Amino acid sequence: MKIYYENDIDMEILADKKIAVIGYGSQGEAQARNMADSGLNVIVGLRRGGSSWKKAHDDGMNVMTIEDASREADIIHILIPDEIQETVFEQSIRPYLKEGNTISFSHGYNIHYGYIKAPEGVNVTMVAPKGPGAMVRRTYLEGFGIPGLVAVEVDATGDAMEQALAMAKACGLARAGVLETTFREETETDLFGEQAVLCGGVTELINTAFKTLVRAGYQPEIAYFETCHELKLIVDLIYERGFRGMWHNVSNTAEFGGLTRRGRIITEETEKEMDEILKEIQNGKFAKEWALENRAGAPMLKRMRKLESELEIEEVGSKLRKLCGLEK
């Protein structure tokens, strides 16, 4: 796999380009400010009167409506939530695109599943930091950065990859390393990671383990510490040193117990379900389900959010996070 670093990338290709960042949330703010601080001509496109308008203006950004930003820019970098991108694109971006323009994303979802289709003669690229916006900005200011991905779905001008790499460098990503991928690979692996591990799998594992201890008569507070609070310590070890480094830094008892029991938690049946989850991502079933959910006003999501907020582990966790000074 090719990894690009700062010395591999020439930002001169963007010298005469105007870049519109659409959205000013976590990623929008970080990427817009980093690119501006790197000397690029950046404008921010927002809904007039929206909550982010004043924030972006106070940060010194050149703020205008999405329509005006799309009309003025050579590169339109779309960093608003997946579920509203199609509507915003069709209403406020597509009418102003010109041949030779570039539309860029930090997640391939809407391009990969066909909800957004670029007009003829327009590049489609991706610049995707592998971390939250706050970290993208903080590490940039510290003189380093976080790794990132770049991809090209449509190269209408012959230099789309060079543009994407230059944007990644301007965001600070090439300081750590930029990897080339595809829209399909980024989208499908990102969704699978979220569903099977990072957001879905981990929370279900934690809550099930917590309920097991409470059901057996242990104090909920102790159960929380053992199944949730201490998870960060282990994840940090894995993040910094890998599995081997984590095993080396826990007790022999923990290592033996973990290695001999983990296969009883993640079973062959679990692996089959993971395969099924991946298939639903690959064949578009999940994307269709999410689209229908949004068109209906997200009733299932709202209901599940309410149920999550009422979990015992949430009540106990809030109390203990206050005790630890993590929550006010």
From Swiss-Prot:
List of catalytic residues: H107
Keywords: Amino-acid biosynthesis, Branched-chain amino acid biosynthesis, Magnesium, Metal-binding, NADP, Oxidoreductase
KARI N-terminal Rossmann domain mapped to chain residues: 1-181
Residues that bind Mg(2+) 1: D190, E194
Residues bound to NADP(+): Y24, G25, S26, Q27, R47, S52, D82, E83, I84, Q85, G133
Pathway: Amino-acid biosynthesis; L-isoleucine biosynthesis; L-isoleucine from 2-oxobutanoate: step 2/4; Amino-acid biosynthesis; L-valine biosynthesis; L-valine from pyruvate: step 2/4
Cofactor binding note of this UniProt entry: Binds 2 magnesium ions per subunit.
KARI C-terminal knotted domain: residues covered: 182-327
Positions bound to Mg(2+) 2: D190, E226, E230
BP term (GO), one: isoleucine biosynthetic process
GO function terms (MF aspect): ketol-acid reductoisomerase activity; magnesium ion binding; NADP binding
One Pfam family here: KARI_C
Residues the record lists as binding substrate: S251
Superkingdom of the organism of origin: Archaea
UniProt function note: Involved in the biosynthesis of branched-chain amino acids (BCAA). Catalyzes an alkyl-migration followed by a ketol-acid reduction of (S)-2-acetolactate (S2AL) to yield (R)-2,3-dihydroxy-isovalerate. In the isomerase reaction, S2AL is rearranged via a Mg-dependent methyl migration to produce 3-hydroxy-3-methyl-2-ketobutyrate (HMKB). In the reductase reaction, this 2-ketoacid undergoes a metal-dependent reduction by NADPH to yield (R)-2,3-dihydroxy-isovalerate.
Entry similarity comment: Belongs to the ketol-acid reductoisomerase family.
Name of protein: Ketol-acid reductoisomerase (NADP(+))
Lineage, broadest ranks: Archaea, Methanobacteriati, Methanobacteriota, Methanomada group, Methanobacteria
